[in-house]
Amino acid sequence: VQKERFRYFIKVPELAAFYNEITDYRTAEDVGVDRPHKNEILHHIPPTPEQEDFIQKLMQFAKTGDATLLGRPPLSETEEKAKMLIATDYARKMALDMRMIDPNYEDHPDNKASHCAKTIAEYYHKYDAQKGTQFVFSDLGTYQPGDGWNVYSEIKRKLTEDYGIPASEVRFIQECKTDKARKAVIDAMNAGTVRVLFGSTSMLGTGVNAQKRCVAIHHLDTPWRPSDLQQRDGRGVRAGNEIAKHFAGNNVDVIIYAVEKSLDSYKFNLLHCKQTFISQLKSGAMGARTIDEGAMDEKSGMNFSEYMALLSGNTDLLDKAKLEKRIASLEGERKSFNKGKRDSEFKLEAKTGELRNNTAVIEAMTEDWNRFLSVV
């Protein structure tokens, strides 16, 4: 089913002015909420040899639509129409872990799970005396009891086996099947007896007031909406975070893991652009007259040229894709301007003719009036 959404916005300052006529927008900073600052860290990860090989297959699939390259049956007629959405989904899974695509792939010391486990362990030991806690978010590879391999369990295995962190201090929010169990885990996070909590945006992003000891938040993937990222970060960047305030310079580190030659960085930057647009619109501080929200979303994936440029790692190709998009936009604006110009010229000519006719009528009527007055 074809989906439609707003992507391109014009006359943005006028839109912002109209919005601010009916709203009174204030941020936490505006009203002086006492909460930690967010320190974003983009953690770049080189692709593993298996990922490099799969990236080439993804590029060929995007060109040809040959699904057998990805180890799946040929695309149906319906799937063919959603080829770029399928390609985008595979690229997301590949960036998280190759075992998301095929569990027969081997572990690798430089994959995202290994980097995340190492970073979690560093924060764990750095704030061990204060019992600092950490949140780990991923909407892919979530924990499902008895459902085989998942990235949550893999990182927990590395934390316990490679870094000596007690298994009882690493929990998954999906383990909590009742409100009572959920509250017990939240209380344990605030007490510091649970130090690392994994979860998805929907299950851990809201209704979890476990910020008391939070020192770091880890994003293994990036959600589609800016509001979801804000909800994730809000687990630690909120009032009542005592450890961050007294022992971490009133900062909470937010680590975003991005595999090079994947869609990770692009998606994160796209999310930032959306959030900037929303914030500027609400505050009325708009600079640009037009906003392009971006071509990539969860319903349609991303366009072919940008997909190929990102996976190839060739920034020239990405710049070329952006310039081609800009040229197409300018050509559209030129056509619109020329059409408006022609319409205006036609109207001007018509009005000029009307003016000449009306002037002649006025002159004739004036002459008749003067003749009438002379007779009377």
Residue ranges, per PLM feature:
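Conserved helicase motor "Helicase C" RecA-like lobe of SF1/SF2 P-loop NTPases
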Residues: 141-172
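Conserved helicase core region in the C-terminal RecA-like lobe
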Residues: 46, 187-188, 197-206, 221-224
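Conserved SF2 helicase motif VI
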Residues: 225-247
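C-terminal accessory regions of helicase/translocase ATPases
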Residues: 121, 158, 162, 302-376
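Conserved strand-helix element at the start of the C-terminal RecA-like helicase core
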Residues: 72-87, 129-153
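Inter-lobe coupling linker of SF2 helicases/translocases
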Residues: 1-106, 110, 118, 122, ...
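A short beta-strand element within the Helicase C-terminal
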Residues: 209-222, 253-256
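Conserved helicase ATPase core of P-loop NTP-dependent helicases/translocases
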Residues: 166-201
